[in-house]
């Protein structure tokens, strides 16, 4: 059995401004989750979507009782590169400062997300946004719909 594939996205009307996040499981989009904040950033919504998706699914077990493999698919290079290129390891080592010696943005979301990634069998895959990927288009619509009006 392959991994549980979860698509995630974040949206923001203005940056900062009101924003929304969403996730949905492939192949049909169910289950899914979404929410929003009155004042946020697009990057923050991208990270929150992944955090909520993993909080919802991390306790699932595979057929052998181990952690179910999960693949997060995102159009956010910010999220995907953090894990693919291990940015988070450097952030921790450098006291939560980025390569420019500035405080890492959204550390309040990154820390719990990194803890979940450490204890979950999860991989990350980037997908080009607005490229006709049906599931990416779905989570984009859900995230936009979740933006507070």
Task: Locate the predicted segments by residue.
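Short, conserved alpha-helix that lines the donor NDP-sugar binding/gating region
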Residues: 46, 50
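A two-mode feature
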Residues: 116, 139, 143-148
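RNase H catalytic domain
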Residues: 11-15, 51-138
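RNase H-like nuclease fold core
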Residues: 1-44, 55-57, 144-145, 149
């Amino acid at each position: 059995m392959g991994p549980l594939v979860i698509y995630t996205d974040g949206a923001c009307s203005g940056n900062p401004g009101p924003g929304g996040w969403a996730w949905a499981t492939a192949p049909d989009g169910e289950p899914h989750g979404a929410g929003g904040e009155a004042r946020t950033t697009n990057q923050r919504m991208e990270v929150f979507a992944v955090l909520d998706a993993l909080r919802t699914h991390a306790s699932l077990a595979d057929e052998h009782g181990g952690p179910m493999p999960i693949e997060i698919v995102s159009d956010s290079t910010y999220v995907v590169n953090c894990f693919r290129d291990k940015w988070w390891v450097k952030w921790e080592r450098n006291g939560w400062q980025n390569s420019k010696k500035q405080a890492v943005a959204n550390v309040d979301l990154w820390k719990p997300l990194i803890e979940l990634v450490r204890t979950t069998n999860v991989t990350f895959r980037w997908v080009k946004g607005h490229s006709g990927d049906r599931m990416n288009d779905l989570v984009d619509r859900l995230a936009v719909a979740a933006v507070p009006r």
